[in-house]
């Protein structure tokens, strides 16, 4: 099983990053996609992906950091995307929940990254919070120019999920679905996601599954917990976990064009 969303550049992993990666593979994870959320972290993610086997990375600017976007950023992302470890542009998108960057700054950076991905024929790794309508409006003109797209850490509604799937967008599901307080709506729509459009992820070190036992004392999530998330998703979808692992792995290979 492949974790499509690991924030391995996080300072929370600074002291034991090697052990975190080793634990993931010991637990049965067979590949990691390391998320780049700004230029500096995208550069770090690429270096980590080169350092560890069966790891790849994304290169892009998260909506929270969109105020940093400038011409030099674009040039650096394009240069970074030429590295073999980098297999997607992102994390890019819109987040109108907290607006750490203004909506205008977010939209400018998002469209710029969609254009880069289209020009480089690379898939996009996307983020959307409380911005679905505007997100889809900006994305729609680019979808037929992109080889693929995933909306990572999906937490939206049934209608939003169906709108994405209808346009060929992959849906990334995290341990959010294991949260009995805020993940119930997501849990109910799990069976409606076509298996061929489903991807799984931890978003580590964030989103530690609330039903994980025993819970780590650090309360830190890590990719070794992906098997737990997979098992819970398979249970709620009424599918065999091994089959779902193989299916989501095949989806990773199709979307990102990688072998593992």
From Swiss-Prot:
Documented EC number(s): 3.1.11.-, 3.1.13.-
Listed CDD domains: TatD_DNAse
Superkingdom of the organism of origin: Bacteria
Class of this enzyme: hydrolase
PROSITE patterns attached to this UniProt entry: TATD_2 (PS01090), TATD_3 (PS01091)
SUPFAM superfamilies: Metallo-dependent hydrolases (SSF51556)
InterPro entries for this protein: DNase_TatD-rel_CS, Exonuc_TatD, Metal_Hydrolase, TatD-like, TatD-type_Hydrolase
Binding site for a divalent metal cation: 91, 127, 152
One Gene Ontology term, aspect cellular component: cytoplasm
Cofactor annotation: Mg(2+)
One GO molecular-function entry: single-stranded DNA 3'-5' DNA exonuclease activity
Keywords: Cytoplasm, Exonuclease, Hydrolase, Magnesium, Metal-binding, Nuclease
Protein task: 3'-5' exonuclease that prefers single-stranded DNA and RNA. May play a role in the H(2)O(2)-induced DNA damage repair.
HAMAP family tied to this protein: TatD_exonuclease
Protein name, UniProt field: 3'-5' ssDNA/RNA exonuclease TatD
Organism: Shigella flexneri serotype 5b (strain 8401)
Lineage, broadest ranks: Bacteria, Pseudomonadati, Pseudomonadota, Gammaproteobacteria, Enterobacterales
């Amino acid at each position: 099983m492949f974790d499509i969303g690991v924030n391995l550049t996080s300072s929370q992993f600074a002291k034991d990053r090697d052990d975190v990666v080793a634990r993931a593979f010991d637990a049965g994870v067979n590949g990691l996609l390391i998320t780049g959320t700004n230029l500096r972290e995208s550069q770090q993610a690429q270096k980590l992906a080169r350092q560890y086997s069966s790891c790849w990375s994304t290169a892009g600017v998260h909506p929270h950091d969109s105020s940093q976007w400038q011409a030099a950023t674009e040039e650096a992302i394009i240069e970074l995307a030429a590295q073999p470890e980098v297999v997607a542009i992102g994390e890019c998108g819109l987040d109108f929940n907290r607006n750490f960057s203004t909506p205008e700054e977010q939209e400018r950076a998002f469209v710029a990254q969609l254009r880069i991905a289209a020009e480089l024929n690379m898939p996009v790794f996307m983020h959307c919070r409380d911005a679905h309508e505007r997100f889809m409006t900006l994305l729609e003109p680019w979808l037929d120019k992109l080889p693929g797209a995933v909306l990572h850490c999906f937490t939206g509604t049934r209608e939003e999920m169906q709108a994405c799937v209808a346009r060929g967008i992959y849906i990334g599901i995290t341990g959010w679905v294991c949260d009995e307080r805020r993940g119930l709506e997501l849990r109910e729509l799990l069976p409606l996601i076509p298996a061929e459009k489903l991807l799984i992820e931890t978003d580590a070190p964030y989103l530690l599954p609330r039903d994980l036992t025993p819970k780590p004392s650090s309360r830190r999530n890590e990719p070794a917990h992906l098997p737990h998330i997979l098992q819970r998703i398979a249970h709620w979808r009424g599918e065999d976990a091994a089959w779902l692992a193989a299916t989501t792995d095949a989806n990773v290979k199709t979307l990102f064009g990688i072998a593992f």
